[in-house]
Design a protein with these regions (language model features):
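Non-catalytic, surface beta->alpha helical segment in thiol-disulfide oxidoreductase systems
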Residues: 127-171
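Typically the conserved alpha-helix immediately C-terminal to a functionally engaged Cys/Sec
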Residues: 86-101
Length: 171
């Protein structure tokens, strides 16, 4: 009987955890995918790749590596669904209207309203959209960026030369 009691006590003691009952498990750190879909997949012209969920700096680093491997230049692009110049630029890029001007440009696309909080963690906090930024080697924002545009039919014509100047200094 003493032996059975001793086994019971020892087995119950082995089941005890240091966590209180009902405690949530610690959060797991999620790593971004090693591959960002849409980066480096287009042979020539502007490519728009929606940024996946996760740590912005890590995603940007992965996307930049992919773009470089394909001899493309990556910029972080932040737009918004309510931004008229963003819509006009996006439309022109999707239809290949900017391919001749920017044959090796890859844009990692974020939405300011959806992604704003996680963008701030990586120092991407534009005052205006659209925002185009050259990422640093750490995946965070650099001062090499441009933001904002005029509204109306001239929006794309306003963005293109400024974007060209930005790219001329991009690594």
């Amino acid at each position: 009987m003493k032996r059975a009691l001793a086994i019971l006590v020892l087995s119950l003691a082995g089941c005890r955890t240091s966590e209180p009952a009902g405690a949530d498990p610690p959060p797991q750190k999620t790593e971004p995918a090693a591959h960002v879909a849409g980066i480096g997949e287009k042979a020539t012209g502007v490519e728009l790749a929606d940024a996946p969920d996760g740590d912005v700096a890590a995603i940007v680093r992965a996307a930049r590596d992919q773009a470089r491997a394909k001899k493309r230049t990556l910029l972080v692009y932040i737009g918004a669904t309510w931004c008229e110049p963003c819509k006009r630029f996006h439309y022109a890029a999707e239809r290949g209207q900017l391919d001749a001007e920017f044959p090796t440009l890859s844009l990692l696309v974020f939405d300011l309203d959806r992604d704003g909080d996680r963008l701030k963690v990586a120092s991407y906090a534009p005052g205006y959209v659209p925002y185009f930024g050259v990422p640093g080697d750490d995946g965070k924002a650099t001062s090499n960026a441009m933001e904002g545009s005029i509204k109306g039919e001239g929006a794309v014509k306003n963005i293109v030369p400024r974007l060209g100047r930005l790219l001329s200094g991009a690594p």
